[in-house]
Amino acid sequence: MRSPASTPSIRGGAFASSPILRHNHLPFLRLNPPSSSPTRSSPPSIQCSVQFRPCIDIHKGKVKQIVGSTLKDLKDDDGSDPITNFESDKSAAEYATLYKQDGLKGGHVIMLGADPFSKAASLEALHAYPGGLQVGGGINSDNCLSYIEEGASHVIVTSYVFNNGQMDLERLKDLVRIVGKERLVLDLSCRKKEGKYAIVTDRWQKFSDVSLDAKVMEFLANFADEFLVHGVDVEGKKLGIDEELVALLGKHSPIPVTYAGGVTVMDDLERIRTAGMDNVDVTVGSALDIFGGNLAYKDVVAWHNQQKVSVA
């Protein structure tokens, strides 16, 4: 069981077979959180079991698996291409339909670029599975509501709420005002820097001044329904999970949190369940056979279903 929030203030076979703030200085903790924020007397946010959260990463309109640390922000593009682990011949909508058929909710569609092809593909996925997918990539106050209207359950934001490496609280509050806390996911993806997990923005290329820790998660939980955290140092490399990061999330996140990065074998799912104290959901990308890897998607779905049985 996930403990309640206590603080006020991210292959063919499966298709065939399936039917802010600077670290330690929280300058706006003095400010009142939005009216929809949890309080000590609020009903607890409970998740009954660890879940597998599927993903659809879209780059130039195609479903791909990319080594996240090789992505470039468009305005800083030097002409080099990111390292691509896999490019699918299936559409984003086909993946969405697969996840819908298998009863997998809360997966994320990420647009790895601002091109119109990626946006069109993401909308096709949302239309194929209305209410079942979250969407991120270029989300801001001008377009966030439109994605909800197109069928997204939540919008995922990171770079928009940072400015020069610090959290822009006014932007964050605007998003809450427009779509509501209950439809907002904060992407707190991070990389290790000087022994701490620094939140990274702009396609994971820029370090913010914000380190992911208990106080930061406690505060930001007032403005979001969930967190999504990619372990960027291991993401897309199939080198194993960042167990230290998973443990940090499991111990300190007061709201549902999903970890992504480095899952290679089934044992990694159990390691996440254990290190995260049954509080951390998991996304698997490049390792899955539906994305060209060796880990059977059907086995991961079976593991997901077993988690629900275990707590029934």
Swiss-Prot record:
Pathway: Amino-acid biosynthesis; L-histidine biosynthesis; L-histidine from 5-phospho-alpha-D-ribose 1-diphosphate: step 4/9. 5-[(5-phospho-1-deoxy-D-ribulos-1-ylimino)methylamino]-1-(5-phospho-beta-D-ribosyl)imidazole-4-carboxamide binds at residues 65, 108, 138, 158-159, 187, 204, 236, 262, 285-286. One of its GO terms (biological process) is L-histidine biosynthetic process. Its cofactor is Na(+). The keyword Metal-binding applies. Na(+) 2 binds at residues 159, 162. Na(+) 1 binds at residues 65-66, 235. InterPro entries: Aldolase_TIM, His6-like_euk, His_biosynth, Isoase_HisA-like, RibuloseP-bd_barrel. GO terms for cellular component: chloroplast; cytoplasm. Binds 2 sodium ions to optimize substrate binding. Residues 1-67 form a transit peptide. 1-(5-phospho-beta-D-ribosyl)-5-[(5-phospho-beta-D-ribosylamino)methylideneamino]imidazole-4-carboxamide binds at residues 57, 68, 138, 158-159, 187, 203-204, 230, 236, 262, 285-286. Keywords: Amino-acid biosynthesis, Chloroplast, Histidine biosynthesis, Isomerase, Metal-binding, Plastid, Sodium, Transit peptide. Component of the histidine biosynthesis pathway that catalyzes the isomerization of 5'-ProFAR (pro-phosphoribosyl formimino-5-aminoimidazole-4-carboxamide ribonucleotide, referred as 1-(5-phospho-beta-D-ribosyl)-5-[(5-phospho-beta-D-ribosylamino)methylideneamino]imidazole-4-carboxamide) to PrFAR (phosphoribulosyl formimino-5-aminoimidazole-4-carboxamide ribonucleotide, referred as 5-[(5-phospho-1-deoxy-D-ribulos-1-ylimino)methylamino]-1-(5-phospho-beta-D-ribosyl)imidazole-4-carboxamide). Belongs to the HisA/HisF family. This is 1-(5-phosphoribosyl)-5-[(5-phosphoribosylamino)methylideneamino] imidazole-4-carboxamide isomerase HISN3, chloroplastic.
